[in-house]
From Swiss-Prot:
It is found in: Secreted; Secreted, Extracellular space, Extracellular matrix. GO terms for molecular function: enzyme inhibitor activity; identical protein binding; lipase binding; lipase inhibitor activity. It comes from Mus musculus. The gene is Angptl4. Residues 104-152 form a coiled coil. This is Angiopoietin-related protein 4.
Length: 410
């Protein structure tokens, strides 16, 4: 492979490209493959970009030279076109070849012009070729990232330390060695309950893939009642829950700490199935409360309405009629869907939630490290009215969901 001398990164690129091209068409060697590191991939991409910039700069310089040649030819005037007749004289002194110029000089200029045009075309072809190659490399990186999502271990238990956890996850140095067969691996479980049915009994981070959804990581709690998917956790105020609609839709936070899984992911897990919602509450004296009730969760077209049955619907202030009972739409400060016509509950309080009329519950409110003295401030906190009252900010909460068939089976 012939590489023109360019910048240092381009030389690295040429070497890497030559290696890739030479590997094509040869049968696989028995020795284990050498994996390119993530830094080498970055260097390859950086080299591609530098080569592209270098080629473009060369094109610009060539264009400047071409412009100079064109100006020199323009100075020749009509003489560059030659006489109109076999013996036709020049019309006037302006048509004459400038002093010091000869037909041989004009011929040389034309030859140089053609050569420069040819070089420009070749450079444009090289730039286009490198851009296509860079696009293919970007596509390959994206495909490999998808494959690592499929190859990632479906389980990271809570008991392992960070060092051992790092060993469980594939590193970027392994990406280049992945084979096309990786796409035919077993599909991850639909939810934590399906993982429980497959024999998993340890709680921790797992990869799931609900129907019609790409795979993603969730925190699973394995109990005697089956597998529960954790969709929310508050415990120390490390994450700001006063987020926008898009943030609540997509999810935010740290699955190992405080987080909100995301309304769209919750909806993909529940689908059209009925689910059981578990609400774990804790006050500042160490007392705990567990609530469980059936729900349906609508899609974005219903503002992710939480559809409830009696008596929970009354407890949470649901009044909208839905196919599965009474419903509470989800609201944020920039998407007001609550049942108060004169007030935006998310703005008045804090966080996004199924507010109802603002006064029944809000587990995504402002986190307080101690109970504020002012009642006006306490109302913005995390509360569940039927337990500890409207103005008692809770210390910790966890929300979990499980398909109804699991509850019926147990």
């Amino acid at each position: 492979m012939r590489c023109a001398p360019t910048a240092g990164a381009a030389l690295v690129l040429c070497a890497a490209t030559a290696g890739l091209l030479s590997a094509q068409g040869r049968p696989a060697q028995p020795e284990p493959p050498r994996f390119a590191s993530w830094d080498e991939m970055n260097l390859l991409a950086h080299g591609l970009l530098q080569l592209g910039h270098g080629l473009r700069e060369h094109v610009e310089r060539t264009r400047g030279q071409l412009g100079a040649l064109e100006r020199r030819m323009a100075a020749c005037g009509n003489a560059c076109q030659g006489p109109k007749g076999k013996d036709a004289p020049f019309k006037d002194s302006e048509d004459r070849v400038p002093e010091g110029q000869t037909p041989e000089t004009l011929q040389s200029l034309q030859t140089q012009l053609k050569a420069q045009n040819s070089k420009i075309q070749q450079l444009f072809q090289k730039v286009a070729q490198q851009q296509r190659y860079l696009s293919k490399q970007n596509l390959r990186i994206q495909n490999l990232q998808s494959q690592i999502d499929l190859l990632a271990p479906t389980h990271l238990d809570n008991g392992v330390d960070k060092t051992s956890r790092g060993k469980r996850l594939p590193k970027m140095t392994q990406l280049i060695g992945l084979t096309p067969n990786a796409t035919h691996l077993h599909r991850p479980p639909r939810d934590c309950q399906e993982l429980f049915q497959e024999g998993e009994r340890h709680s921790g981070l797992f990869q799931i893939q609900p129907l019609g959804s790409p795979p993603f990581l969730v925190n699973c709690e394995m109990t005697s009642d089956g597998g529960w998917t954790v969709i929310q956790r508050r415990l120390n105020g490390s994450v700001d829950f006063n987020q926008s609609w898009e943030a609540y839709k997509d999810g935010f936070g740290d699955p190992q700490g405080e987080f909100w899984l995301g309304l769209e992911k919750m909806h993909s897990i529940t689908g059209n199935r009925g689910s059981q919602l578990a609400v774990q509450l804790q006050d500042w004296d160490g007392n705990a409360k567990l609530l469980q009730f059936p729900i349906h969760l609508g899609g974005e077209d219903t503002a992710y309405s939480l559809q409830l049955t009696e008596p929970t619907a009354n407890e949470l202030g649901a009044t909208n009629v839905s196919p599965n009972g009474l419903s509470l739409p989800f609201s944020t400060w920039d998407q007001d869907h609550d049942l108060r016509g004169d007030l935006n509950c998310a703005k008045s309080l804090s966080g996004g939630w199924w507010f109802g009329t603002c006064s029944h519950s809000n587990l995504n409110g402002q986190y307080f490290h101690s109970i504020p003295r002012q009642r006006q401030e306490r109302k913005k906190g995390i509360f569940w009215k039927t337990w500890k009252g409207r103005y008692y900010p809770l210390q910790a909460t966890t929300l979990l969901i499980q398909p109804m068939e699991a509850t019926a089976a147990s």
